[in-house]
């Protein structure tokens, strides 16, 4: 038992001391040059266990430092998609670096500095690759899309969240849609391709994010 505890402690220390180093290969990536905040989403394996974590990192005096303790997270039911391989409906979370611009939720306002959009009953996110509004937020009376996702759900998974700017500019048909950071269904749940965490942690993230610091999310940074 003591040996196991020591190994767990060592693993935790290693994660703390190397997490910022994982940003180094992305230092010149588009979107990273002006970023002052990063959400680093990783998978971590120890013995026979694999978990996913979100590390909130902030740049201080040109150095990346952890802004908060790492948070438990869940991802797509089929894991991460390597860069460029995400496809509509594949159940995978896209790997890569993406901007964070707009928060959303059910209440009229949220405790965040980010631009915020209240989601109403008729708000839809189009996931029909053949529709001209693919991967766009639109009102129900403005679309004839064959497939879409209601943004005000009965299960409260979108009670609070933030849009991950994946495949949004430009939008490419079939490469995936509706990728968000949102509230999870539980620690043992999965998503259709989003990143999710507890409501408490999502609120912490929303309260921390600062649009003046050009926040981004880096998903699965160890994927070449």
Model-derived segments and spans:
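Cell wall/extracellular polymer interaction/catalysis modules
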Residues: 16-191, 202-224
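Sec-dependent signal peptide recognition
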Residues: 1-4
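Conserved "landmark" site that anchors the functional core of diverse proteins
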Residues: 198
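Short cysteine clusters
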Residues: 194
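C-terminal motif of bacterial Sec signal peptides marking the signal peptidase cleavage site
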Residues: 11-12
């Amino acid at each position: 038992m003591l040996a196991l505890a020591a190994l767990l402690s060592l693993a935790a220390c290693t994660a703390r001391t190397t997490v910022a180093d994982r940003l180094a290969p992305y230092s010149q990536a588009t979107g990273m040059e002006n970023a002052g905040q990063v959400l680093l989403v990783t998978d971590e394996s120890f013995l026979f266990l694999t978990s996913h974590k979100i590390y909130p990192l902030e740049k201080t005096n040109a150095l990346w430092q952890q802004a908060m303790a790492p948070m438990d997270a869940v991802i797509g039911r089929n894991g991460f998609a390597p860069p460029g391989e995400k496809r509509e409906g594949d159940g995978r979370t896209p790997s890569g670096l993406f901007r964070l611009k707009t928060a959303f939720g059910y209440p009229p306002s949220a405790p965040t500095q980010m631009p915020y959009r209240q989601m109403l009953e008729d708000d839809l996110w189009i996931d029909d690759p053949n529709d001209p509004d693919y991967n766009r937020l639109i009102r129900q009376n403005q679309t004839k899309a064959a497939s879409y996702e209601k943004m005000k759900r009965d299960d409260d998974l979108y009670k609070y969240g933030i849009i991950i700017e994946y495949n949004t500019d430009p939008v490419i048909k079939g490469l995936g849609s509706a990728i968000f950071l949102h509230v999870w269904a539980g620690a043992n749940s999965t998503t259709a391709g989003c990143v999710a965490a507890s409501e408490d942690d999502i609120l912490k993230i929303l309260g921390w994010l600062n649009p003046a610091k050009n926040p981004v999310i880096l998903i699965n940074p160890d994927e070449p």
